[in-house]
Structure formats: C-alpha cells, structure tokens
Swiss-Prot record:
Protein name, entry field: Heat shock protein 104
Residue span of region Disordered: 441-460, 880-905
Subunit structure: Homohexamer, forming a ring with a central pore.
Pfam family, one: Clp_N
Swiss-Prot/TrEMBL keywords: ATP-binding, Chaperone, Coiled coil, Cytoplasm, Nucleotide-binding, Nucleus, Repeat, Stress response
Annotated organism of origin: Schizosaccharomyces pombe (strain 972 / ATCC 24843)
Region (NBD2): 547-738
Domain notes: Has 2 AAA ATPase type nucleotide-binding domains (NBDs) per monomer. ATP binding to NBD1 triggers binding of polypeptides and stimulates ATP hydrolysis at NBD2. Nucleotide binding to NBD2 is crucial for oligomerization.
This protein's record includes keyword Coiled coil: yes
Amino acid sequence: MADYPFTDKAAKTLSDAYSIAQSYGHSQLTPIHIAAALLSDSDSNGTTLLRTIVDKAGGDGQKFERSVTSRLVRLPAQDPPPEQVTLSPESAKLLRNAHELQKTQKDSYIAQDHFIAVFTKDDTLKSLLAEAGVTPKAFEFAVNNVRGNKRIDSKNAEEGFDALNKFTVDLTELARNGQLDPVIGREDEIRRTIRVLSRRTKNNPVLIGEPGVGKTSIAEGLARRIIDDDVPANLSNCKLLSLDVGSLVAGSKFRGEFEERIKSVLKEVEESETPIILFVDEMHLLMGAGSGGEGGMDAANLLKPMLARGKLHCIGATTLAEYKKYIEKDAAFERRFQIILVKEPSIEDTISILRGLKEKYEVHHGVTISDRALVTAAHLASRYLTSRRLPDSAIDLVDEAAAAVRVTRESQPEVLDNLERKLRQLRVEIRALEREKDEASKERLKAARKEAEQVEEETRPIREKYELEKSRGSELQDAKRRLDELKAKAEDAERRNDFTLAADLKYYGIPDLQKRIEYLEQQKRKADAEAIANAQPGSEPLLIDVVGPDQINEIVARWTGIPVTRLKTTEKERLLNMEKVLSKQVIGQNEAVTAVANAIRLSRAGLSDPNQPIASFLFCGPSGTGKTLLTKALASFMFDDENAMIRIDMSEYMEKHSVSRLIGAPPGYVGHEAGGQLTEQLRRRPYSVILFDEIEKAAPEVLTVLLQVLDDGRITSGQGQVVDAKNAVIIMTSNLGAEYLTTDNESDDGKIDSTTREMVMNSIRGFFRPEFLNRISSIVIFNRLRRVDIRNIVENRILEVQKRLQSNHRSIKIEVSDEAKDLLGSAGYSPAYGARPLNRVIQNQVLNPMAVLILNGQLRDKETAHVVVQNGKIFVKPNHEANANGSADIDMDGIDDDVNDEELE
C-alpha cells in the first residue's frame, strides 16, 4: 500500500479509516471503514464528498450514512482491541481497483474520488448504495460530474472538486426560494449594471459607494430580475454566484493550494453549460489574497486573463476608500472593470425602501411596524446617525426597535411576574409553618393561606388575559409567516409554468389567508379600543407588539445619548423650572442662566436650527463669578454628572501648531492615527457640553478652526472625517474686559450699566475677529458678585462640605449660625476675585478647626458641629474634652479672619 501514490486527502482518509477500526476494536480494515472515514471527513467544507455524490446520484444520503454506521457496529470486535490493524482482502482489492482507475484516467495520484468510484465493485458497499436508492450507472455519472475534466496532477487536487458549491453562494437560487429581501428602488443602478454586463468587452461592472448605501442589494436585485426573466436574452438563463473570498483563503496552508482552488472555480465557471456571473463582494480582498508573501500569485492576477478575454462576467463591489487604496494601484486590473457609482438614497427613497422591507421584518419578529415608525427612522437616521449611511442606518433602527418589542413581548409582564413571585413565597412559607405546632404559627398559617388564595385569585384573570393576548399574537404571527411562504410558492409556480398551482394559491389560498389576517388584526384593534374606552386599572394591554415612533426614538437615544424621546411630564416640568435649578448653584447670574435655559428648551422643543449647534455662548466676566460653574451645572442638569462634559483648557493651545492636538495630526505626522482631543471625544459623545476655558489664551489659528463648528455644527478631523457637533452646547469663557467690571458701577439689582457693558464689548471686539464673534449665539457678560450673593454662596459651600463628609463616610452634621454665615460672607467678599476667596476663608476658619477636633476626639461620628461667632471670630464648638495626648495645644486663635486679605495683598 505504501507504493501507491495518494493525494493528501486520500492518505488522510486511509489514516482515519485505521483509527476508526482501532476505536471499534476491529482487527481488519474493511471497505466499510473507508466509507465511514469518507463520510466523517472533517476537512471538507459543508457536506462530505461521498455524501454529495450519493445525493447527486439520486439516492438518500442520510439513509446511506445510517446503513454504513449500522454495518460498522455489527462487525466482529476484539476486547482488548488489537495492537495492529491489518488490511482485509476486500480493502486490498478496492485499493488495487482505485490504482488501476488512476492509471486509466492518466492521473498522477490516487484521490478520494477513485476510492468512491470503485465502491460499486465491492459487494457490501454496492448493496448499501442500492438500499439508499443508487444505481451503479447513476453513481458513476455523479462521480464523473463532480470530477469534471480535471486531472489529479498534485497532492491537493481535491480542493478543486465541486469548487462552485464550496466557494460560492447561488444568489439566483436564494431569490427563487424567496430568501432574499426585496430590492426597492435602485432601478437606474440595476439597469446600468445590465448594460455593462451586455457589452462585448469590459463587461464587468464594479459597484462603488459608501458603506451601507446598498451595493450588495443591487446584485440581489439583479438575481431577482434574472429569475423573473426581466433581463435581456443574453442574461436570461444566467446564474449569479457570490464568491466567498474568505472560504477560498481559509485552510490553504501550503503554497499553491489557494491558486488551485481559484483555478478550479474559474475553470468550472468557464466550462459550465449555464452562463455564470460571478459577484465579488468586498472586491478589494482579491488584491493580495492568497499571495502569502512567498511569490505566490494573488487572486486578482489569476482573474486578469479571463477578464481580458471576456470569458468571465464579474460584478465587483467595494467602497470608495478601498477602491482608491487597493484597486487603483493595479491599473491593469482596474481597466477591466467599469465603475458604477452607488449614491446614498434620499430620505424619501429610504422611506420607500423601508416600506418594501416592512413585511419581512414583521414576519421575522412577529410584530406590527407602523408607517410612522418607518418615517421617523429615516429622518432620525439622517439627522443623528451622521457617521453612517442611509438606508443601512435606518434599517438597523427599525430592526433593533422590532427586536426590542419582541423581547419585551416574549417576556412575562412585570405585574404578573410580581404576583407569581409573591405566590411562590407564600407557598414556601405555608409549607414551613405546617410543621410548627405553636399557636402563633397556626395563626400565621391561617393568614398566609388566606393571603395566598387572594393572590391566586388576583393572578388568575391576569394570566388568562396574558395567555389570550399571547395566543392571539402567535396566531397572527403564524398567519403572516404562512402568507409569506405562500407568496414565494406562487411566484415559483409561475416561473415553472405550473399555472394550476399558481392559480390555486393566487386566487384561493392567499386571499383566504389575507382575510384571516385582516380578521385577526380587526379583533386585536377592537380589543385594544375596548381596553382604552374602559380605562380601568388592568384593562390596558399586557403585551405590546407594535413598533411606533417612540420605540425608534428610544433606540436612537440609546445609540447616541441624544434625548430624542418624546418629552415626558417630569422632563417638561424640569425644563420649565430650569432657571430655578441652575440659579441654586450659580448665584447672582440671572441673565446667563436664562440664556442657557432658553437654548436648551428650544432644542428639546424642536425649534432650534438643525444645521447648527444647540447653542454657542461666550461667557465674559471677572474671575470667580461662576462662568465655569454654570457650565458644570448645565452638564449636571443634562447628564446628572457635572464632569460629563468635554473640557478643553485653551491655555494648553497657545502655540500655532497645537491646533493639531485639537483635531488630530495631519497625514504623515506622528500621532495621525490617534485623532484629536476634541474630535475623538465628540465622535463618541455627540450630545455633550463643550467647554473652551479661557478662550483668549489660545493662539488665533486655534480659534479659526472653531469657525466651522460655530457656523455649521461640524468639524473635520486630521483624518478627513467630518465630525458632527450639531447636538452639542458650546461654551467659551473669557476674562476680557474684567477690569471694567471690578469697580462699583452696577445698579442695586446687580445689573451692569450700559456704559460698562459697551466698554467690555469693545474689549471683546478688539481681541476677537468679527467673523468669530458673528457666529456666536449669545455673548453673556457676568455680573460682579454683591455681598448678598456671597451670603447665599456661603450656604452652598457649607452644603458642599456636608456632601463631602457623607461621601467620605463621616456622619457629621454642620450647623452654621446666621451670624457666622454673615461673618464668613464678609471675610470672603472680594470684588476683584469673586467667590474664590470664600473657599479659602471657609477652609481656614471652619474646616481646619473641624479637622483638629475630629482627630482629637472632640467631634465624633453621628454628632453635630456647631459653627458660631465668639469675640468677633468664627469658632467651632467642641462636643467633648480633648484627648490627653497634647493635641489640644494647637492654637486655634492663630487662624484669623484677615487671612484672605493677607493672601490677596
């Protein structure tokens, strides 16, 4: 046997056969073992070669496999198994016959199909094939059909057997079986593809467009037209096969294997009796595929000769970027294809596409998708999912919304789940109490049984209602699925000219089922209307199976973080009271708070310009008046976290070249792939507050970059990607003109007089360019803080200290007397420095003494710290005597109320 030249797969088949014989304890290797090894060939793609041949010969492949396994089990076995398995006379004869066949066919090696071809010369295998319904003549024809005209001239020649079935997907067959989604629109692109395919030379179109615009669907639309005979005569009998480049490359371990596979595919295409059009999705994968860097040819070079001779009809599909990167570099390959540009459809076209796909998604998810949901999906995808393309983004929205409704519907309703949990707990309690003998347990047992009966009585109607709604929904879902199948059968019958079946389905089966679906939908609508009319607790439907605009809004909000959901009552109240919420944190700046609140309300009410940021502000004023604090308060209001904002400190962008840190380094520079600090954060969180702190510190070139952000709500990164900023609030802070605001030039209500305001504005105009200022929504000048404002800020700061103690797990309450608050406000008031000195005063006069008292044991957990005024100074009262460790000798009087003035002088 060692003298026979086997291919790699044939040698592995014999090795597997020996292993099978050894595992069953058989002393000899019989043809049954070889057949079993061929049926369990783990290296084959999909079905095994033997199973494919049996099926092609008209036999029952599954029955043949069962017969081989049954015969294998009945062979005599040894225990313990023999150390060495010998070749039976029947197997030796089978190998000799295979060797003779190899010589007859002038092959260089014995392959798997040689083994299979001589199965009919073995009595045992011949009888098994006969049981499976295979005749010797049909079997021989099937073997030759799989082999084709190929010659076994290499050890891996079997890779090319039945290559089209292994490495391609028949799109025309999928379309015939109704397994492809309908293609709506794209008529111009499909017609252009047909025209290119009908050319005499260069009849290979390549579909180029952005990801998600529907390039693959054009090929599917062409497959649909071919089976509907809606193409010219030269394409009417064609098969459209999609080439799987991944399967071609996968498993090609040695040099030459990949080339062998693709040559087999091309040869089968060329020799096929039916004209074949090859569709290559992601065509750029052909460039370099299979070369392996060892001098091997890539797939593109193997395709070139057939493309040049016009013997191969090929449709390619790739993106603009990948076409430029890979295909344009190979001019010889590029010129053999004719470009067809696939543009992104409009919103109206996308809605039409969604309407065409609606039925497929309804059947798949078992839900009803409203037309308003489709319109909402198209508009929201276009507006908010700017990094993706229609119609793919809109289809994904509808798909996920339908999936969310389906998951909710197939889960048990919360009210029913809670009742059943309660009932289970009561039953467990009853079983435990039944073992007890005391009077208290007996009383509790009686009460538990009564409560269990009440819960069971309450659960029963809800469960019945749930089961009724579920069965009604299931029946409707099954009817829609059945209708989809009948429509596919009717179309197939028309194509096969089976007009009797087509007429039965078209005029009897389908109309009857449509009437049934209409009746079920009517019953459901009637039940829902009755529930709404009754408006009693528990009368509303338990199961929701309709996808509406609200469900689409929720998916968009989940994906982007942008609150596009319908305004709820609680949120409406929050937005209407926004000034009150912000004013509690930002004291004395009513004008700024009102401007910010109005911008957010405009956006959530849908009245803001969709082509600009939500709002852009320039906050000007003295240091410490609350410019940055208002930004934090806004972020806290919108996202419940004051740190949930994009903060750019412009003092870090004082050089010209630092603009690359903002938007990313240009191509060729170090850090190009990393992206910019602004653009990358904005891509991840499109709905955010962007703070440019101390804007006047930045270089003028950096401010120039912000012009497009303020005007069109977009910014182009260093990588050429357009980043959307239309859902961001842009806030810039500046101290320009602060020197005019430090003097006492304001009215009693804290507002700045017109003269001072004009002086500040002149200072701003003198620094910033007109085109920059002209793009800002509102310039807000912050007032100088008054003493009454400082008094209110004291209370806020004390509350912050209280929260800090709680976060550090200190249960100490702080009580500050009104006199102490007034004294702290007086000591912390500074017109030039705003509220920041107050923080230092509170730290020196309240927090430092408290820290000493806590460490000294004079102030303990779950106690109150009393802050009062004694002898004109702030004093924190101790609650206990000092520990006898000398700590009480610290001089508290050394901390006086002049510390603020000393620090600022």
